[in-house]
């Protein structure tokens, strides 16, 4: 087999890169001139964020994993993550209610105080997506929900490991049932049900505040069901993008319209005490283009 030499590859890349750069530049210019792409607004303060430098992440993947027809713990993965800018605190009740007043958001169900130091709760995935659009329009920056991978990266040592620790080669489903029962019983025994002011649950090593307290956080990651072979390698995968992963003391899949998790909508396990969210500031160069095309942060 003959492989192209390095000079030919460089020439081919150059011939593609220049037109691509011109198209991107022209698209951006047209977008800003036409108002399709957001420019920096002056309608309100930008939320406080933390910046996490690029680094390694080891976490247990989200989803439901099966081998030989039996549920097993999700595999752990090690990846390199790019730097991340994410809200230090969860979105406040006051800020969300301001979005409601300005017509950008749907009124929340829970009658908690509209305070600047109290996280908003009683909001669905759809509500969070509407708020992200409103904040992006208001600030001229792109804000979106984090993926579960991004939230795990930000949460660092506070991110939960939901493994049951059962021997993956065990063919006795009763062992997993008993371990799952003990875990869910322990989760239900340690409840502080009402939202607490900012800072009540401390900060992690990255400066992220209150993660893993009594508020689970929406992510943009869909629930997936993965079938593994005998070597724990994926052989098939199915996503359900009407159900999204929330994370807090443990991970919990919730339907996108659920506002009150204790009232139903959790696929498995103990329901979260409360559900809220925080956003990532998306600084990818193409984020404004995605925003303009889709009409929402992606």
Over which residues does each language-model region extend?
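Short linear capping/connector segments at secondary-structure termini
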Residues: 110-118
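A short glycine-rich, aromatic-capped structural motif
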Residues: 40-107, 126, 213
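Disulfide-stabilized, aromatic/cysteine-rich ligand-recognition loop
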Residues: 2-36, 203, 238-298
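Short Gly/Pro-enriched turn/cap motifs at secondary-structure boundaries
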Residues: 75-76, 197-200, 267-271
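Functional-site microenvironments in short loops/helix caps that host divalent-cation chemistry
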Residues: 114, 125, 129-261, 297
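Soluble non-cytosolic domains of exported or imported proteins
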Residues: 86, 90-91, 118-126, 145, ...
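Short capping motifs at secondary-structure boundaries
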Residues: 84, 91, 97-108, 135-141, ...
């Amino acid at each position: 087999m003959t492989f192209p030499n390095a000079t030919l590859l460089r020439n081919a890349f150059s011939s593609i890169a220049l037109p691509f750069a011109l198209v991107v530049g022209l698209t951006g210019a047209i977008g800003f001139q036409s108002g399709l792409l957001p420019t920096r607004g002056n309608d309100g303060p930008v939320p406080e964020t933390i910046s996490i430098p690029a680094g390694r992440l080891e976490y247990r993947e989200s989803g439901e994993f099966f081998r030989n027809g039996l549920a097993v713990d999700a595999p752990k993965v090690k990846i390199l993550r790019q730097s991340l800018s994410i809200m230090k605190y969860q979105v406040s009740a006051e800020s969300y209610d301001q979005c409601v007043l300005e017509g950008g958001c749907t009124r929340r169900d829970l009658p908690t105080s509209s305070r600047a130091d109290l996280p908003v709760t009683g909001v669905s995935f759809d509500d969070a997506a509407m708020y992200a659009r409103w904040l992006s329009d208001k600030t001229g920056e792109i804000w979106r929900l984090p993926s579960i991978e991004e939230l795990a990266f930000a949460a660092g040592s506070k991110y939960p490991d939901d493994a049951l620790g059962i021997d993956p080669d065990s063919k006795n489903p009763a062992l997993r049932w008993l371990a799952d029962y003990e875990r869910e019983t322990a989760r239900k025994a340690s409840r502080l049900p009402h939202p607490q002011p900012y800072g009540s649950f401390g900060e992690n090593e990255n400066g992220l505040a209150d993660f893993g307290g009594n508020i689970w956080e929406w992510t943009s990651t869909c629930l997936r069901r993965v079938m593994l072979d005998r070597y724990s390698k994926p052989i098939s995968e199915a996503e359900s993008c009407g159900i999204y992963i929330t994370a807090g003391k443990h991970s919990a899949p919730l339907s996108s319209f659920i506002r009150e998790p204790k009232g139903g909508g959790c696929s498995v396990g103990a329901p979260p005490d409360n559900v809220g969210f925080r956003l990532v500031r998306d600084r990818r160069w193409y984020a404004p283009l995605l925003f303009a095309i889709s009409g929402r942060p992606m």
